[in-house]
A protein has these predicted regions:
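Bacterial N-terminal signal peptides that target proteins for export
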Residues: 1-10
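Bilobed "Venus flytrap"/periplasmic-binding protein-like clamshell domains
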Residues: 39-71, 138-209, 213, 292-296
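Paired acidic/hydrophobic, glycine-rich loop segments that form the ligand-binding mouth/hinge
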Residues: 92-96, 216-222
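C-terminal motif of bacterial Sec signal peptides marking the signal peptidase cleavage site
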Residues: 17-20
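An extracytoplasmic/periplasmic, membrane-proximal ligand-sensing/linker region
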Residues: 177-179, 183, 189-194, 263-308
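A bilobed periplasmic-binding-protein/Venus flytrap-type ligand-binding module shared by bacterial periplasmic
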Residues: 143-153, 247-260
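Ligand-binding "clamshell"
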Residues: 105-113, 119-134, 213-215, 227-241
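Bacterial signal peptide processing site
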Residues: 22-25
Length: 308
């Protein structure tokens, strides 16, 4: 109950914050017709980590190239928070990870292993809420647990279950919501019986530095992280399926679809089709490791793909 209350209060506070900090083209309230038959700007949010911000830039820039006015609101928050902003009318659309949508928003722990089955379940949930899932990406940025090669060798670790054999506590660097999510500490304890795990709250992106320094023993990561391009880290296998399929699909309000016509879905789907795992890992590396702006990285990708 406490978690639910915190999520609701957080969502309400967020909605007020979004309304207060809207751009010049955004009233912050429910979308209305701007003038005559011209639809109001599409209010797009993103979750609060680099890949999510990059996705927002990709979708928003492609839509703007087609004449859709977009107000991009990056770093809104976790799935629980940003979905509350969507249902509360502060946003019209945002890119979401299907597995997280099912487990943390829809509270569906069935964990379909087939991406198409997961998509159908997520779409059915959103339709009941008055929203629609657009086409999903080829890439799946699944959650995973990473350790250093040295730690893996010292303890003979290959799978998540092997963490149970590590003497003493295993410190996992992860974002704060990891401690209360099924795709996190809750699922790891339920599916693997791991009682020796302790979380160290870290901002997304800082877990690799914590691994390198020895501050943590393991880290919650995303499989398209640019840091995983080399062999500096070992991803532990997840045979019991705590971390589900994480293809991305924009969640959009039906009103926005009506207001902006078929070009909204067609343009977003065209972007999604180009987002392979290789493309995302490369762009993530440019943003996180090379320090480039997500806006510039997205612009280059869209121009190469002839989507801008």
């Amino acid at each position: 109950m406490r978690r639910l209350l915190l999520a609701v209060v957080g969502g309400l506070v967020l909605a007020l914050a979004l309304a207060a900090c809207g751009g010049a083209d955004d009233s912050g309230g429910p979308a209305t017709r701007a003038s005559g038959d011209e639809p109001a700007p599409l209010r797009m949010g993103t979750k609060n980590f680099p890949e999510a911000v990059l996705l927002g830039e990709l979708y928003s820039q492609a839509l703007q190239a087609k004449g859709v006015r977009v107000v991009l609101k990056p770093n809104v928050g976790s799935s629980e928070i940003i979905h509350e902003a969507l249902t509360g009318g502060a946003l019209d659309i945002y890119p979401e990870y299907i597995g997280v949508l099912l487990s943390e928003v829809a509270n569906d722990r069935s964990r379909p292993s087939d991406p198409r089955a997961a998509y159908r379940a997520a779409d059915a949930f959103e339709e009941r809420q008055g929203f629609t899932l657009l086409g999903m990406t080829p890439f799946s940025d699944s959650n995973a647990i990473a350790v250093t090669p040295r730690f893996a060798r010292e303890h003979g670790i290959r799978t998540i279950a092997d963490l149970g054999r590590v003497p003493g506590r295993v410190r996992i660097g992860a974002p704060p919501e990891f401690a209360t999510r099924f795709e996190g500490l809750v699922g790891l304890r339920q599916r693997y019986g791991l009682r020796n795990l302790r979380t160290t709250p870290l901002m997304i992106g800082r877990q690799y530095r914590a691994l390198d320094s020895g501050r943590v023993d393991a880290a919650a990561v995303f499989t398209t992280d640019g840091q995983l391009s080399g062999k500096r880290y070992v991803l532990l296998e997840d045979p019991r399926g705590v971390f589900g399929t994480q293809h991305v699909a924009p969640v959009v309000s039906r009103k926005a679809l009506r207001d902006h016509g078929p070009q909204l879905a067609a343009t977003a789907d065209a972007v999604s089709r180009r987002l392979t795992a290789r493309a995302m890992r490369r762009m993530n590396a440019e943003v996180v490791l090379e320090g480039r702006e997500p806006r510039a990285v997205a612009d280059e990708f869209l121009r190469r793909a002839k989507l801008k």
